[in-house]
Curated annotation (Swiss-Prot):
This is Protein RacC. The gene is racC.
Amino acid sequence: MITNYEATVVTTDDIVHEVNLEGKRIGYVIKTENKETPFTVVDIDGPSGNVKTLDEGVKKMCLVHIGKNLPAEKKAEFLATLIAMKLKGEI
């Protein structure tokens, strides 16, 4: 299972962050002026939305892509890991 991901800043002004997973671009996290959820996640293949931190946006986007690309026999283990992460407050 994939255990790491990479977030790369695309612009020099720290507004647009390109998100890469295993060397493939999967989306962007964009800094906005919204006070409550200052980052917008723009997923190339999936859902988009607002989050509170850059790390949260990157983590959620990567988890969606990891889950989509897992073989069926690994999905139960992945869902158990997601539940454990949720219970620990990691997501």
